[in-house]
């Protein structure tokens, strides 16, 4: 794990003659002491430093159940929504919108389909016929052969770079469960595990915090590799306990239900420690969040 430290704490640097750089031998001897001191100094002793656009989103341990979140993939982005975390489409969302959200200290997550492509995707032609599978349950979207990392990696890397360039600090990996569907390829559990871990590693290499969307049957194996989870309808499907590896590791779980009322499901999801809300299936701006505990 890399620890990002602010360039300085407190007020502006003093003027005067610059200090002479230490010799290489002195620097080597001083390094252990500097590291120890860094780990011992309380972080609240420093002034808050805004996270730069290319830095991974930090997820404070155990705070998710006290957060509100928004998941919007259709319609004009409503930047006025009172939410701490925004999950958005990186293609449709403009840099001006992400800049406004960052100005309001919101945490930004882009959604990237890593195991599928749509005919309307700007980069759809980059996927050769050999990796294009059968249709998913959504119009004009098809599964990909996730065993072909050599083909998928460069396309996914560019999708992640788009997120980073627009100021997102995290990425939610959607359609990461093709093995559990009729994808058109003989995908197995281990094929999917290998791919999902590779994608998480790729996201980190491009300074994005990786999150897993659904794929509940692999959560126990993948929770150590991901920083957060996004789930749809675990209450309706009676599968919320599958997400405990994330909450027990003090990692956020962002949850949504499309049916029922918050009065009926919030007791369950907030009890699990999820950040939870009700949405319509088109994932427009409307939301009905669970009350904070």
Walk through the language-model features, giving the residues of each.
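Secretory targeting and sorting signals
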Residues: 1-7, 17, 22-50
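Glycan-processing catalytic domains of CAZymes
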Residues: 50-293
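Interdomain coupling and dimerization elements in large ATP-driven molecular machines
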Residues: 13-15
